[in-house]
Amino acid sequence: MQYRHEWKHEISVFDVLCLRIAGGGITVNSCSEGIESPEIFIEDGDITVTSTDDGINACGTETADGSLPGVTINGGTVTLLNPSGRDADGIDSNGNIDINGGLVYISLVGDGSNCALDYGSENGGVCRINGGTVVACGGSTMLETMSETSAQPSLLYAGATQAAGTEIALQDTDDKTLLTFAAPNSFSAVLVSCPEMQLGSTYTLTLGAISQEITLTQVADSYGVSGGTGQGGSPGLPQKGLTPPIDSDFLSLL
């Protein structure tokens, strides 16, 4: 697709087999499901989806060649917003999610069981970040960390609910800002990743007026509430489907 258009519909961009977006602009102002197909490839373009259900959904049980459904983002800018939905996801795949490049910003209201990135781990699916910049904000009820087979480190924080408009920033030890995003909706979990992040390095994660230094110890790192361990994460995160407490102060969690 190499055009700009605006939609207001139940499912805004759909293909029964495979959908590839190669450039241009797509703006979905209001919908239930945003972009839906068993296979979705985003190569380039400027895409903004405001939905009440999933922003991007790799649906079904298998693709035309019999493999798992999947979402692959190789470039472009993808912004997924959900200010009012419940049990909704930013990117939802019944199989895999692969982010290899581009800019991906997700902001779902942080109550209910809204999950910024939801993949089919129960079906053998994986969620890999191999490149690009990702800031994915949502609820903390259905958390999944990224897969350890990711080539690029990521950090998942879950804890106290942060207000709409809270600015998220990540800085290195030289005070260089690596990423920043002002989340339009409240959130209780955020995942960040960018090409500059390296294992063993220390970063400062800032949420509004509070901040904490964190040293990355594994590819899919996580900090937050006490509980079980999510897929690929450090101890201290809840398992998918469990509800963590959200009344702790951020600084006391880390």
Role assignments for model-derived ranges:
Residues 1-254:
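A composition-driven surface/loop motif
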